[in-house]
Regions:
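Short hydrophobic alpha-helices at membrane interfaces in multi-pass membrane enzymes
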Residues: 19-21, 116-121, 154-175, 317-319
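Transmembrane-helix motifs of polytopic, lipid-linked glycan transferases
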Residues: 25, 91-113, 150
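Short helix- or helix-capping micro-motifs
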Residues: 24-27, 121-126, 174, 178
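Extracytoplasmic catalytic/substrate-binding loops of multi-pass membrane glycan-assembly enzymes
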Residues: 37-48, 61-74, 84-87, 276-283
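Loop-to-helix entry region of an early transmembrane alpha helix in multi-pass inner-membrane enzymes
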Residues: 69-73, 83-102, 134, 138
Length: 319
């Protein structure tokens, strides 16, 4: 039986919601089964230790070498609720990894994906080697994927319904993403540029209340970052550096005061890191990994790009 025939037979035996639930349960099992089987990776051990220290001593100050604060506060919270162990440390990444599938369903509810596309997207997320791996790994990556997808869902709901709560949710998702890793600004820039393109080409329009909604979203976005990066107000110097100290500015100058902020130190640190050959390899290094581990998804991504640029091409012919 051909693949298309198998898919048709499965759809005739099971309803859409039954298949979706089976995919969700399968994703849950892949992410939770023997979650503490491996010893902590070096990165995981560092993150778990900082989280444990935060729980026990209440000590955390943003250090750009170890990325943003969200992971440490969230993991410390899990340790407080369930005890400190390898399993508990990896539990939140696993749950965030599973949350991607309900987020795909949310896009389906808006009509952007039909039932077959929703099942296919959920199936690939559930089985993707990289998604499964990082869902079982105490690092920022899977959280960033989840918050980016949540941001997309919030923006789509705002476009469809124009309600303030979706704008606020978009601001929260973007703000939380900014508290994870320093590459989130690049993801936000991509979304912003695409949004500007859609508005400029009149493919979308904004509701009458968009100014109010954008302002609320901005305050939620900034407020979320201020709370986390200042360690909930205990380390305002991460936000302001020495800008609020006139004596320091008088002696050392304004530029030196700005140099002490977490924002400046993060940019300085990661620019210097990228100027080093830390993980050397050819420009196509990650393309090889995609071909090796994610070939079906890569093929569909290329087909989707072709469909977007050549409107006469129908992706449904491939599905």
């Amino acid at each position: 039986m051909k693949a298309a025939g198998i898919a048709t037979w499965i759809q005739s035996k099971f309803s859409f919601h039954t298949l979706f639930l089976l995919i969700f349960v399968g994703a849950l099992l892949l992410r939770l089964w023997a979650l503490d089987l491996k010893l902590f990776h070096h990165d995981e051990a560092v993150h778990a230790w900082f989280s444990y220290r935060l729980l026990q001593e209440g000590i955390y100050v943003y250090d750009p070498s170890y990325h943003g604060p969200f992971l440490y506060y969230a993991t410390a919270g899990m340790f407080a609720l369930l005890g400190d162990s390898d399993l508990v440390g990896r539990l939140l990444p696993a749950l965030f990894g599973v949350s991607l599938i309900p987020l795909v369903y949310s896009i389906h509810r808006l009509g952007y994906l039909d039932e077959r596309q929703t099942l296919l997207a959920s199936f690939f997320i559930a089985l993707s080697p990289e998604m499964v791996y990082f869902s079982r790994f105490l690092r920022q990556d899977i959280f960033q994927v989840a918050f980016t997808l949540l941001l997309l869902v919030a923006l789509l709901y705002y476009h469809s319904h124009g309600r303030l709560r979706y704008a606020a949710l978009a601001g929260l998702a973007a703000g939380l993403g900014m508290t994870l890793k320093e590459d989130m600004p690049l993801l936000l820039l991509i979304l912003l540029l695409y949004g500007i393109y859609l508005l400029w080409s009149k493919k979308i329009s904004l509701p009458c209340s968009w100014r109010r909604d954008a302002l609320v979203s901005f305050f939620v976005f900034v407020g979320t970052m201020l709370l986390f990066y200042s360690s909930f107000g205990t380390h305002p110097e991460v936000i302001f550096g020495q800008i609020l100290d006139p004596g320091y500015i008088q002696v050392n100058g304004l530029f030196s005061a700005i140099n002490q902020t977490g924002w400046y130190r993060a940019a300085e640190h990661w620019i210097s890191m990228h100027n080093m050959c830390r993980i050397c390899g050819p420009w196509f290094f990650y393309l090889v990994l995609l071909i090796l581990y994610e070939l079906p998804i890569l093929i569909l991504a290329v087909a989707g790009t072709i469909q977007f640029t050549m409107r006469g091409f129908s992706l449904s012919k491939l599905l």
